Design a protein with these regions (language model features):
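Bacterial Sec-pathway N-terminal export signals of envelope proteins
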Residues: 19-76, 191-193, 229-275, 346, ...
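Acidic, low-complexity, intrinsically disordered peripheral segments
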Residues: 65, 74-77, 411-433
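Periplasmic alpha-helical coiled-coil/stalk elements that build and connect Gram-negative outer-membrane
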Residues: 51, 141, 145-256, 356-359, ...
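Amphipathic alpha-helical coiled-coil segments
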Residues: 41-56, 144, 148-167, 185, ...
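Bacterial Sec-dependent N-terminal signal peptides
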Residues: 1-36, 419, 427, 433
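Flexible, solvent-exposed loop segments that connect beta-strands
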Residues: 77-101
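Small/polar (Gly/Ser/Thr/Ala-rich) solvent-exposed segments
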Residues: 40, 63-77, 101-105, 115-143, ...
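Transmembrane beta-barrel architecture of outer-membrane proteins
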Residues: 107-111, 154, 199, 286, ...
Length: 433
């Protein structure tokens, strides 16, 4: 009866995870690229930058406006001027009394005006700067995608480890249940004490607690993967590939400056360089053309008299309180700062690559040691189990051996997991992912 109770307890621990969903690594990465909210935000940034570039077309395209304005006045100057514009002036209108005290009159003006930029050197350079900004934002999106792919690979690797560890712990629980059954039988026969039974039960509880912890971590990792993939689900994911030691693509991989994050910084620096040139171009004159066509009439819908005017404007801001020169100086400082920040970022990432390579070597050594320790612990447990069955070993010794064997199995799996995580990091830093 007790054996059945412990078996039921073991099953009840794993019962919540029956609703599981197999998950392939590439499927997870594909869903991330389609649905991840961060990537959607990055895409909006690209669209906004493209829109900024479109706005600069105003520096090349004409501005066209139409207006219709009505007046009613007895002001001497305007009254006579409106008559001139309507082309209705007569000899009698030059009478001083009429000039000084005109009758009130109405006037309607329909105007078509056009303004055409001709030479605005700063706008040319501003468009080049915005193109570099668009490239930088696109690289930032690519970097975000690469980073999210790395996060998925790391989470997937940890999930593989947890399931392998769970299998090891599950076997350990079954082994403890069997030891408990044998110890209870030996107690019935007078070969074991009640304290031995309690000792086994305590050991079983400890292993079951480990399984609960593993199941909780699996659920948390599944939630994290769902978020990365942009999936609103509470499914528990199961890796379709088991945990194995992954090969490194190139043991002599060098740091790559062609990574998306560094390319984004390079484009950002180039954009600032173009902005510096743009501010310098504002010191040059600007040439713009303009023209307008007018209809003048006393009736609201009249198109009586008409006239046109065209011209060009050359403007040059010779001095604006030293504002332009201060802006140029500020932009130079910002450019130097951006260049130094990029250099610092590259130096830190090179250090990170060296660290990751050393971690890889250390993890390989850990795998070798963990493999030996696991084999030794397994052989030790086999010997002690045989002696325990013959009554030649204490229950405490058997429990210690079982705990050690389980620990070494998990340590071996953990070493493989850490090795694979180091590979993921190296491949990212060397742009091999």
């Amino acid at each position: 009866m007790k054996k059945h109770w412990f078996t039921f307890l073991f099953l009840s621990v794993t019962l919540p995870f029956f609703a599981q969903q197999p998950l392939e690594l590439q499927t997870a990465i594909g869903l991330m690229k389609e649905n991840n909210t961060q990537l959607k935000i990055q895409q909006h940034e690209i669209e906004l930058s493209n829109n900024e570039l479109s706005e600069t077309l105003s520096g090349f395209l004409p501005s066209v406006a139409v207006s219709h304005t009505g007046f009613y006045t007895n002001d001497p100057l305007n009254a006579f001027g409106f008559k001139l514009q309507q082309q209705i002036v007569t000899q009698a209108d030059f009478n001083p009394d009429l000039l000084n005290n005109p009758d009130a009159m109405q006037h309607f003006n329909t105007k078509l005006s056009v303004q055409q930029p001709l030479l605005n050197f700063d706008v040319f350079v501003a468009r080049k700067a915005l193109r570099e900004k668009i490239k930088a934002v696109a690289y930032q999106k690519q970097y975000a995608e690469d980073m999210l792919a790395v996060e998925i690979k790391k989470a997937y690797t940890n999930l593989q480890f947890l399931y392998e560890a769970k299998n090891a712990v599950s076997k350990g629980i079954l082994a403890y249940i069997e030891v408990l059954r044998n110890t209870q039988n030996m107690q019935t026969q007078g070969y074991a004490k009640p304290s031995d039974v309690l000792m086994v039960q305590v050991g079983l509880s400890e292993v079951q607690n480990k399984q609960i912890e593993i199941d909780n971590n699996i659920a948390n990792l599944s939630d994290y993967l769902s978020w990365l993939m942009g999936e609103e689900t509470t499914l528990i994911y199961v890796p379709t590939q088991s945990l194995t030691q992954n090969p490194l693509i190139d043991h002599n991989s060098l740091f790559s400056e062609n990574r998306a994050d560094i390319m984004a910084m390079k484009s950002g620096v180039e954009a600032q360089r173009k902005m510096l040139s743009m501010h310098k171009q504002t010191l040059l004159p600007r040439l713009n053309a303009f023209g307008e066509f007018n209809y003048q009439d006393r009736d609201i819908a009249g198109l009586g008299a008409n006239a046109y005017m065209v011209g060009a404007s050359l403007s040059w801001d010779l001095f604006n309180g030293n504002k332009t020169f201060n802006t140029i100086k500020k932009t130079k400082i910002s450019l130097s700062k951006a260049q130094d920040e990029m250099q610092l970022y590259i130096e830190k990432n090179k250090l990170e690559l060296q660290k990751s390579k050393r971690d890889l070597e250390a993890n390989q050594a850990k795998i070798n040691l963990a493999t030996t320790a696991k084999n030794q612990a397994n052989e030790t447990l086999r010997i002690i189990e045989n002696r325990y069955a013959q009554g030649l070993e204490k229950t405490a010794d058997l429990l210690v051996s079982q705990a050690t064997e389980l620990e070494k199995q998990v340590k071996h799996l953990e070493a493989i997991k850490d090795y694979n995580l180091s590979i993921i990091q190296i491949e990212f830093l060397t742009n091999k992912n």
